[in-house]
Every structure is written in structure tokens, then in C-alpha cells.
């Protein structure tokens, strides 16, 4: 949320920016993104929360319900709402900061209930009812979805790095257990099958980390190069793919790490069962797998991201080193398959493209 205000705010919300970026715990406020409504999760344009203007410029009263709000007790959440006479769909949504307190008094936010979730228990998630809550317009009216998309890029990137974190911890737990658990007179890490599995988990972890940080590199480069640059198009393509792939890998890795620990890994109180539960949400929030796939299609179609991707991959494959020669050959074969798939998508109708996304 602080990143968003730094980019789009005109200075009128400096108070909240300072609170969100404070180093002193007593002054710190946490941010959140209240986006999902009961009738519109991924279909953001169906949101029904309304924002009525007040006599004060840039100040609105928000009325509506938000259905799945993570970090529900945030001090300065961002909320999407529709002003009177704004168009339907995402084009009519504006972005507001809705603090939990206004002039020292509680804002008109009603926390209906907390969700009883499978995992991420340490992050309170619940339903919020806005009953004429005071909200401050962020940026320009009816540009809220664009601003929120900017925030989603960042959130998807942190989702990818969070997935890498879960994979790393799960791998560590599996390695430690395998190094200490004895069976049939030796530690189980000495058995060929376990050696193979631990190596494969390690490769997956390192690949996921490399991919996530490569996407992060282009996210940072885009800040310097602007939205018309190759870095921007690569960022828009790599971030959803990194989110999609690392989330799935975290679920698989945490599941197998639990298996390595045997029955103990399945018992509450052991780290692996919590990692497994927490990993389940990674493919869901900030865009499900299908939503991300459709986003990639849009980026390829509307922003020609493949024009930046193809030379980027060719440069990566242009290496001369004996240790990566065979790997580069394997990747080059998959790269050719990717190019063929892109050509097919470009020549088929929209329904075919979505089905095979």
C-alpha cells in the first residue's frame, strides 16, 4: 500500500504514507487490500461497494461489503468502490484509503467475522462491512483498477518469494530428518531413493528461487525504464508465470517434506504440517491459476510481451560452459515448443486460446 501511494498520490495522503513506512513500531500502520466481494472475486468489475462524495474534496463515504479481507485489522487498507454515475465494470472503479480511525475515532467499519481458514492462521482474514466509512480518494477517479493492478504485480511477486520460502523451509526439515532418522541400520538419507528425492527437491527449490528473483529483477528494471520498455513487458509476463509456477511447486514440496517425516510430519506441532497448510493458499490468492493464465494471454495479445521474451531467452541460451551445455540443449528444445505454441495461439480463435492457456 505504501508503494502505491508513493507512485500515485499527490501528497494529500502523506500522513498514511508516513504511518505505513514508519520504523517506530508505535507509529507504524499496516496496509491491506480489500478487494473481494461475495458476488465478485476474480470478477472485480462486478463489485458493488459505492462511494458517495462529501462536502470535502477527495473525501467520500463508502458503503458495501468486502468478503475476504486479509490483514483485516490493518490501519490503512485500500478499497475499491464505485462513485455515483461511474460506468459499470472495472472502468468505473476508484481507489480509496479507508483508515480504521478518523480524527481519533473509529471509522464506520464493521468487522463481521473472521474466516476459519485451513492455513495462514497468523494473518487474520474476515468479512468487513462499510457503513458510510470515510475514505480518501487515491489518484484519479475511475483509475482504481489500474492502480490495484499495479499493486497486484507486487503482491504476486511477494507470493512467489513466499512460496520459495516455504519450499526452502520444507526442504530443510526433510534434509535434517533424513540425516538423523535411522532405519535398517543407517540414516535414511543414504538410501538411493531418498537421495534422488532430496536432490530433486533441491533442484526445484533453487529453480523456483532463480525464477522468482529473475522476475523481481525485471520488476525493478521496469521502475527505471518505464512502462514502454522491454523490462515492463517481461515483468508483466514473468510475474504471473512465476506466481503460478512457484505456488504449485510449494504445495508439492511441502507435501513431500511431510511424507519424509512420516507420521510425525502429519501431526500438529511439527513444522511440516503447518507449511503444507499455509502453502495451499498460494495458488489461490492474488489470482488463481486460471486467472493468471488469462492474464498471460492478455499480455501476449495486448502488450506483445513475446517480442521481449524471445530475444531475452535466446540471450540466456547463448552460453558456452561445459557444465550447462546439456541443460541449455534441453531448454532450447522446450523453447522451440514454446515458440510453436505462441504461433498456434496467434492464429486460433479466442475460445481455443483460453482452453489451452
Could you tell me what each predicted segment is?
Residues 39-42, 68-70, 87, 117-124:
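Short Gly/Pro-enriched turn/cap motifs at secondary-structure boundaries
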